[in-house]
Amino acid sequence: MSLSSAFRTVTNDPGIITWRIEKMELVLVPLSAHGNFYEGDCYIILSTRRVGSLLSQNIHFWIGKDSSQDEQSCAAIYTTQLDDYLGGSPVQHREVQYHESDTFRGYFKRGIIYKKGGVASGMKHVETNTYDVKRLLHVKGKRNIRATEVEMSWDSFNQGDVFLLDLGMVIIQWNGPESNSGERLKAMLLAKDIRDRERGGRAEIGVIEGDKEAASPELMTVLQNTLGRRSIIKPAVPDEVTDQQQKSTIMLYHVSDTTGQLSVTEVATRPLVQELLNHDDCYILDQSGTKIYVWKGKGATKVEKQAAMSKALDFIKMKGYPSSTNVETVNDGAESAMFKQLFQKWSVKDQTTGLGKTFSIGKIAKIFQDKFDVTLLHTKPEVAAQERMVDDGNGKVEVWRIENLELVPVEYQWHGFFYGGDCYLVLYTYDVNGKPCYILYIWQGRHASQDELAASAYQAVEVDQQFGGAPVQVRVSMGKEPRHFMAIFKGKLVIYEGGTSRKGNVEPDPPVRLFQIHGNDKSNTKAVEVSASASSLNSNDVFLLWTQAEHYLWYGKGSSGDERAMAKELAELLCDGDADTVAEGQEPPEFWDLLGGKAPYANDKRLQQETLDIQVRLFECSNKTGRFLVTEVTDFTQDDLSPGDVMLLDTWDQVFLWIGAEANATEKEGALSTAQEYLVTHPSGRDPDTPILIIKQGFEPPTFTGWFLAWDPHIWSEGKSYEQLKNELGDATAIVRITTDMKNATLSLNSSESGPKYYPVEVLLKSQDQELPEDVDPTKKENYLSERDFVSVFGITRGQFVSLPGWKQLQLKKEAGLF
């Protein structure tokens, strides 16, 4: 097959294209069979997504556990050719059965099914309406599940997983006693998907709870008739998981094969910086053997680029890692989000921005504007998300200080003054369509005691409970105040390095104080106390030098007019009047005397603000096993927020922890520590003081919902639970009738020398009794139809037909010409 012919289906339209290697040729897999993989084969999958106006493509070649070496080599070659065909920009992935990447599994929301056999044994990907099936599927996983065909025996079962007995016209789900509701729900959705996609909706589904088998005697009879007498079920088998701590260890190697042998040289370990990557070379990034990345520089030769995957496999062999280790190759300038976030920061070069921080979300620049239309924040939550603002800060503000481990209200005139020796709670109330909404900020001073830090967290829970769990909780570390926090104090936020604001404080104020004032409007301005020495100055900012008798407002050469105006307002608040303005370079001698004399300070021209390339990511978090585990959800939607889970949304400069209404108590109580551990163990070496926002299901602010396309606030009230879906399946009567018919047909097949007592439809349609076969009862012609013909003639299964009243059966037989 020519390449142009093999890739003729490739377009820039979003979606998934799957090919199977058949006799060393690429053969397209029908859409209805996507997610089904034969264990004896190799596949190539192309995923195309649009992020704004940009195209993102990923090529995966999948290796079945029983595939031949020739097929694996062929798949690798076709992957390289497809990459060339698409201009060398796609990210390439090597996927091995049972060890697929989160990205790969994320394509198949209903799950992956591993099927026995392959091309060599004549197995084909068939279209819908196939009922000649008899298999047992072992279903594992909770979010992106995998179902493997296993031996039709009770020996295949265990207490912790879900199993589907698929008999074509009947699918029976057996839930292990130790499986959770999420796994059961996903398995049921898989059973429904098999019914609808492969059986045209014409199959019956039944469910057995493994710890309540006596409640489903009819279904258990079907299982035992098929699998034999029930034996003792084996204990649960723990899933193979990699904790976040293991993933946090990364190593960068330079790769060379100039001597004819693979040579790898260690370059650096965590934290990695982007500047380590030379555009003329190739590198391997090793994530503790859990995943291998190969980075191909733009200046590397074509031969070097094409050999990248084989180099990775040689590296895996050299390190003694399992052959199933996941490999991802990325191109210089087209790196995946997962690769970029292994670095301390990843900048987009040659892009100019203003003074504010800029993020490139999916490579589309999102600039934090100084001014924005507040009315857009709730009608367009994506604006709120990008701006990190729920409103303009004009809501109601209440402030408490932790004093003797209790909450003490802070008087209004002291709102906006925060001391490094204290902890505070700030409750912000705003209105959305007549409904009050709340944000609870927990501000923790750098010099606060451990008891006060613990008390602030405890008191936050108390306040949260007073409002029915509605507040969004935001942990704020001193100096890391988010924009909305600054906005509620209207440009009059002052942070003292130490001390306390509590009454009766006997600690004297220092004779000289120096404040660095940063910000250019009322939503982003604050004054932060720094060491009162000349070395603290910076030419790009404004500083206030304060003493009891004198006040100087020092304008650095690089400060803007807006910054100076905001600093002047703040200085008037701190000085109870005007301060003397001093331009950099025109300082009087007493100015330097107060700072202890002149000293070198940062006086370089303001650096152009770099553009950070950030991909917002969603993770499922768990620490209930004692190990901290995170699983990424790729191409996430609101549907991925399951009420039974704790989810983490990482927007880089802040982290949201979303707590589902049905999450277990342990994970709810440990929410903050979960988010903190995520930051500490992040491979890139994240700032542990990154703001953390804790959000409960049903109380999501627009700064959170804006990251999800078409957020639906009613999705959980309208969505169906596992129990509701289970109840919709009906009783077991139809299943028993169908399986009885199937058993009788099998018995007649085994006992009759003349073959099964089924006849073609055209034979049974004959109207004269004498023309019918001798063994056909003319009043019950439907009994002589095969299962497939029965569904074809009546449009329903045999079990559904039998459950109808007699007059309805008669009517259908007349309409079909079988009466």
From Swiss-Prot:
A single GO CC term for this protein reads: actin cytoskeleton
Q: Which GO terms describe its biological process?
A: actin filament organization; actin filament severing; actin polymerization or depolymerization; barbed-end actin filament capping; cilium assembly; nervous system development; positive regulation of lamellipodium assembly; positive regulation of neuron projection development
Q: Where are the Gelsolin-like repeats?
A: 24-105, 144-215, 265-339, 407-486, 524-592, 631-704
User: What positions are modified (Phosphotyrosine)?
Assistant: Y85, Y758
One Gene Ontology MF term: Arp2/3 complex binding
Q: In which tissues is it expressed?
A: Expressed in dorsal root ganglion (DRG) neurons and superior cervical ganglia (SCG). Expressed in podocytes.
Keywords on record: Actin capping, Actin-binding, Calcium, Cell junction, Cell projection, Cytoplasm, Cytoskeleton, Phosphoprotein, Repeat
Q: Which domain of life is it from?
A: Eukaryota
Spell out the Pfam families in the cross-references. Gelsolin, VHP
Transmembrane domains' residue ranges: none
> Which parts of this chain are annotated as the region Headpiece?
731-819
* Domain annotation HP: ranges: 753-819
Stretch list, region Core: 1-731
Localization? Cytoplasm, Cytoskeleton; Cell projection, Neuron projection; Cell projection, Axon; Cell projection, Lamellipodium
Known CDD domains for this protein? gelsolin_S1_like (cd11290), gelsolin_S2_like (cd11289), gelsolin_S3_like (cd11292), gelsolin_S4_like (cd11293), gelsolin_S5_like (cd11288), gelsolin_S6_like (cd11291)
- Binding positions for a 1,2-diacyl-sn-glycero-3-phospho-(1D-myo-inositol-4,5-bisphosphate)? 109-116, 135-143
* Region (Required for interaction with F-actin) residue spans: 628-819
User: What is annotated about its quaternary structure and interactions?
Assistant: Associates (via C-terminus) with actin. Interacts with F-actin. Interacts with SCARF1; the interaction occurs in embryonic dorsal root ganglions at 18 dpc and induces neurite-like outgrowth. Interacts with PLCE1. Interacts with ACTR2 and ACTR3; associates with the ARP2/3 complex.
Give the protein's function.
Answer: Ca(2+)-regulated actin-binding protein which plays an important role in actin bundling. May have a unique function in the morphogenesis of neuronal cells which form ganglia. Required for SREC1-mediated regulation of neurite-like outgrowth. Plays a role in regenerative sensory axon outgrowth and remodeling processes after peripheral injury in neonates. Involved in the formation of long fine actin-containing filopodia-like structures in fibroblast. Plays a role in ciliogenesis.
Looking up PANTHER family in the UniProt record yields: ADVILLIN, VILLIN
Q: What is known of its domains?
A: The C-terminal domain is necessary for the induction of long fine actin-containing filopodia-like structures in fibroblast and neurite-like outgrowth.
Question: Belongs to which family?
Answer: Belongs to the villin/gelsolin family.
Protein's UniProt name: Advillin
What organism does the UniProt record list as the source? Rattus norvegicus
In the UniProt record, the gene name given for this protein reads Avil
